[in-house]
Design a protein with these regions (language model features):
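C-terminal motif of bacterial Sec signal peptides marking the signal peptidase cleavage site
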Residues: 13-16
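Bacterial signal peptide processing site
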Residues: 18-21
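Bilobed "Venus flytrap"/periplasmic-binding protein-like clamshell domains
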Residues: 27-55, 59-60, 115-181, 275, ...
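Extracytoplasmic
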Residues: 27, 56-58, 68-71, 78, ...
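Pocket-lining segment of extracytoplasmic ligand-binding domains
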Residues: 88-90, 97-99, 126, 163-253, ...
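Segments of small-molecule ligand-sensing domains
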Residues: 243-313
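Bacterial N-terminal signal peptides that target proteins for export
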Residues: 1-7
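Acidic, polar ligand-binding/catalytic clefts
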Residues: 78-115, 125, 195
Length: 313
């Protein structure tokens, strides 16, 4: 029989640098910054919130929709949410104080969750057959405060298209609708696989993904090895073949000042409730105790680090 953390694990002994310490079950508010409806952040965040509600009677949860990574980090640092999803490239800019951030942001990580895949979506019989065909075209580069917008601009610049496209800042659902209605010629999306909005788009519109092999290595050389050249498997969306793209890890980020109790239990909850999270979205299967600690350049929150040490002994 399944048991609740709130009832069974009221306290736990954790071995730290100063010996055994008592970590009590959390209480208070847990607001989760997610992302666009139709994306994985929104689905994963709802699953996390449900897991918290089921296990911690004294924690009140709220799922906060957002533009994505940039807005989530901003909300964490302003105390508008306690935890948020963020792409590793955006998180790296945040702690370094690089644009779009004006100064270093005091964030740390609980886990590396899964990989986001850059997806450049076009109509199957439309005018865009390759990345270079975007020249002069109307494209959505994602919501303004999103990780999609960051990587889309980097790809366009690496491809020499930075000044040659007509940009629109649309979220994933609006992008899909605009493409279906021929209001745009293409849209960028950085998300897990599959992304619901793209799956739904494919049910009523003939679309495909553009191969990004030509910019994969130049992007990595220009912006670092947080990016990886990879493929979107054909099976994910029923494509005719796999499509080369770039991926970047997703981190679960919190403020440095998050209480140790909350950080410890939320990290533990991710793993103890992994099966349920994976039922919420397949990306939940990719959580792993060893890859989860790879959150460069973010430090792990001490509460998260203590939980990982307890299972890695």
């Amino acid at each position: 029989m399944r048991r609740s953390f709130g009832m069974v694990f009221a306290i736990v002994l954790v071995t730290g640098c100063q010996g055994s310490e008592v970590v009590s079950a959390p209480e208070g508010l847990m607001r989760i910054g997610t992302g666009n409806a139709g994306g994985v952040y929104a689905v994963y965040g709802e699953g996390m919130a449900e897991a918290v509600r089921e296990n911690f009677a004294r924690v009140t949860t709220e799922v906060v929709a957002s533009d994505g990574s940039v807005e989530n980090i901003t909300m964490v640092t302003l105390g508008k949410v306690e935890v948020g999803f963020a792409l590793a490239d955006v998180a790296a800019d945040a702690v370094a104080g690089r644009p779009p951030f004006t100064e270093p942001q005091p964030i740390v990580a609980l886990a590396n969750l899964y990989e986001n895949y850059v997806q450049l979506v076009v109509r199957d019989h439309g005018p865009v057959k390759s990345l270079q065909d975007l020249s002069g075209r109307r494209i959505s580069v994602g919501s303004r405060a999103s990780g999609t917008a960051v990587v889309a601009e980097r790809i366009l610049n690496v491809a020499g298209l930075g000044n040659d496209v007509i940009r629109r800042n649309l979220d994933i659902k609006m992008s899909a609708r605009a493409l279906a209605e021929s209001e745009i010629d293409a849209f960028f999306w950085s998300g897990g696989l599959p992304s619901d909005a793209i799956t739904q788009l494919m049910h009523g519109t003939d679309v495909r993904l553009i191969d990004l092999k030509e910019v994969a290595q130049p992007l990595i050389r220009a912006h670092g090895e947080l990016y990886t050249e990879t493929t979107v498997p054909a099976s994910v969306y029923g494509l005719s073949s796999a499509v080369t793209t770039v991926s970047v890890p997703n981190y679960l980020v919190v403020g440095r000042d998050m209480p140790l109790t909350k950080a410890y239990w939320l990290t533990r909850l991710l793993f103890d409730e992994q099966q349920k999270l994976a039922q919420t979205h397949p990306e939940g299967h990719h959580l792993d105790q060893w890859t989860a600690i790879r959150t460069y350049p973010l430090e792990l929150h001490e509460g998260a680090a203590r939980w990982y040490r307890s299972v890695h002994r």
